[in-house]
UniProtKB/Swiss-Prot annotation:
InterPro entries: PsdUridine_synth_cat_dom_sf, PsdUridine_synth_N, tRNA_psdUridine_synth_TruB. One of its GO terms (cellular component) is cytosol. This is Pseudouridylate synthase TRUB1. Highly expressed in heart, skeletal muscle and liver. Expressed at lower levels in lung, small intestine, kidney and spleen. GO terms for biological process: mRNA processing; mRNA pseudouridine synthesis; positive regulation of pre-miRNA processing; tRNA modification. It comes from Homo sapiens (Human). The gene is TRUB1. It is found in: Nucleus; Cytoplasm, Cytosol. The active site is at D121 (nucleophile). The modification N-acetylalanine is found at A2.
Length: 349
């Protein structure tokens, strides 16, 4: 049949008995010559070029992603843990770059190094510092650096976690407490002070986090008080039973313990209702923290360039140690075909 069709197309002397075949072949030839057919062919060719360009673009993005290096900040909302947010960021970047693809997963040495320094509770929001590439080596400096928080405390109620997510363990009256009473005791919590960390924290006993032991219902003994630093603290608002504090502190300081201690000092009790980290090191919530719609390779590259001026050059080579073991440093070395790892919830502020 193929020979006949070829013959029909090339031989106009053949007539009636082969006319259907001649019509079909002729139609195809005619279509190829029409403007619409040429346009269709052009579309197909353009699509092929677009697909090729897309592959090149993805490869370029993947190369750019793996070349990113430095420290930047993201805006952590209430809800996810810091580890969950880091996974979400990682997944968005890998998806944008089309990774992992077969070409990349075969190259097992290609890794995306990403981590965060200074965990925020799931119930807290604010600045979360992220390191990428060799920037992960700089994250330990974030743990010992200064941090600033806005905290809303609630008088008259204590919980086992020292915040509103915990089980209520005690209730006391607060109706006689005045704004002047609160302002009058804040000086006691300023400067170099001793602080007992919360039971629900990343501190460990026999290699296990105290928070994990508490979840199991095990009895956990309080850790001894240790030295911490509060650079400044002020009362921003008082509308009983709620009070708002602005606190700037050093590493290893717990806002939840501060609010609880303030309640006790006032002969009542208190817990943290809302917590926002407004600054960590040189990063501020307003100027530097990227919202989720800016978690793109290009936006992060621009942020890294902008934030590079915030650090002295020698800091990139400095490898400082965390002041204490509850200051969790999460540095993920993500091999592109490595399965996800679930992290426990850790409270560190």
């Amino acid at each position: 049949m193929a020979a006949s069709e070829a013959a029909v197309v090339s031989s106009p002397s053949l007539k009636t008995d082969t006319s259907p075949v001649l019509e079909t072949a002729g139609t195809v030839a005619a279509m190829a010559a029409t403007p619409s057919a040429r346009a269709a062919a052009a579309v197909v060719a353009a699509a092929a070029r677009t697909g090729s360009e897309a592959r090149v673009s993805k490869a370029a993005l993947a190369t750019k992603l793996l070349s990113l290096s430095g420290v930047f900040a993201v805006h952590k909302p209430k809800g996810p843990t810091s580890a969950e947010l880091l996974n979400r960021l990682k997944e968005k970047l890998l998806a944008e770059a089309g990774m992992p693809s077969p070409e990349w997963t075969k190259r097992k040495k290609q890794t995306l190094k990403i981590g965060h320094g200074g965990t925020l509770d799931s119930a807290a929001r604010g600045v979360l510092v992220v390191g990428i590439g060799s920037g992960t080596k700089m994250l330990t400096s974030m743990l010992s650096g200064s941090k600033r928080y806005t905290a809303i405390g609630e008088l008259g109620k204590a919980t086992d976690t020292l915040d509103s997510t915990g089980r209520v363990t005690e209730e006391k009256p607060y109706d006689k407490i005045t704004q002047e009473d609160i302002e009058g005791i804040l000086q006691k919590f300023t400067g170099n002070i001793m602080q007992v960390p919360p039971l629900y924290s990343a501190l460990k006993k026999d290699g296990q986090r105290l928070s994990t032991l508490m979840k199991r219902g095990e009895v956990v003994e309080a850790k001894p008080a240790r030295p911490v630093t509060v650079y400044s603290i002020s009362l921003q608002k008082f509308q009983p039973p709620f009070f708002t504090l602005d606190v700037e502190c050093g590493g290893g300081f717990y806002i939840r313990s501060l609010v609880s201690d303030i309640g006790k000092e006032l002969s009542s009790c208190a817990n943290v209702l809302e917590l926002t980290r407004t600054k960590q090191g040189p990063f501020t919530l307003e100027e530097h923290a990227l919202p989720e719609d800016k978690w793109t390779i290009d936006d992060i590259a621009q942020s890294l360039e902008h934030c590079s001026s915030l650090f002295p050059a020698e800091l990139a080579l400095k490898k400082s140690k965390p002041e204490s073991n509850e200051q969790v440093l999460s540095c993920e070395y993500i091999t592109l075909n490595e399965p996800k790892r679930e992290d426990d919830v850790i409270k560190t502020c």
